[in-house]
Curated annotation (Swiss-Prot):
Pathway of action: Protein biosynthesis; polypeptide chain elongation
Principal subcellular localisation of the protein: cytoplasm
GO molecular function: translation elongation factor activity
Subcellular location: Cytoplasm
GO cellular component terms, A-Z: cytoplasm
Protein name in UniProt: Elongation factor P
Pfam family, one: Elong-fact-P_C
Function: Involved in peptide bond synthesis. Stimulates efficient translation and peptide-bond synthesis on native or reconstituted 70S ribosomes in vitro. Probably functions indirectly by altering the affinity of the ribosome for aminoacyl-tRNA, thus increasing their reactivity as acceptors for peptidyl transferase.
Gene3D superfamilies: 2.30.30.30, Nucleic acid-binding proteins
BP terms from Gene Ontology: peptide biosynthetic process
Recorded family membership: Belongs to the elongation factor P family.
Length: 188
């Protein structure tokens, strides 16, 4: 369906020159003098190439409808990441460039939302929080607990983050998948 360029948002899928693109960033620019434009940065779904386009805000762009479904993460192999539809038990292979940096937070049997166009995976949305174990961090030195500073820690998925001084090696913590920041100590 055709929409005006100024209505395109991050996460939308658009078709251009017969190819599908996921919008990475979309910004409407209104210069003091001249025509307002929409600056859109997008990633081609077929091969992951990023391009940047500039449209007049009134230009027509072909927006593609996508379907969002829950899938269960199974495993990773050299081809990509394998997910299963829990209702139909159909498996789908998601390329590594679609998952991107979120791959570090994928855990076996985790439920994620996959956005699909026909049968092609377009994007993935992980749960906001995951529970991970601290595998390496500095020991607490006496008198250091008075300040509210964070100390560096390495998690079981290899990601580095900052944790409060009372967190030790072996402690399970909850982190935000968006930026890897510490949220709280796990309650389990």
């Amino acid at each position: 369906m055709k929409v005006i360029a100024s209505s395109i948002r991050k996460g939308n899928v658009i078709e251009q020159d017969g190819k599908l693109y996921v919008v990475v960033t979309a910004e409407n620019i209104h210069p003091g003098k001249g025509t307002p434009v929409s600056q859109i940065e997008m990633r081609r779904i077929s091969d992951g190439v990023k391009i940047s386009e500039r449209y007049k805000t009134t230009d027509q762009v072909e927006k593609v409808t996508i379907e969002e479904r829950n899938y269960t993460y199974l495993y990773e192999d050299p081809d990509g990441f394998h997910f299963m539809n829990p209702e139909t038990y159909d498996q789908v292979l998601v390329p590594k460039d679609v998952v991107g940096s979120q791959a570090a937070y994928l855990q076996e049997n985790m439920t994620v939302k996959l956005s699909m166009h026909d049968v092609v995976p377009v994007s993935i949305a992980l749960p906001q929080r995951v529970t991970l174990e601290v595998v390496d961090t500095e020991p607490v030195t006496k008198g250091q607990t008075a300040s509210s500073s964070y100390k560096p820690a390495v998690l079981s998925n290899g990601v580095r983050t900052g944790v409060p001084p009372h967190i030790t090696v072996g402690t399970r913590i909850v982190v935000m998948t968006e930026d890897g920041s510490y949220c709280e100590r796990a309650k389990d």
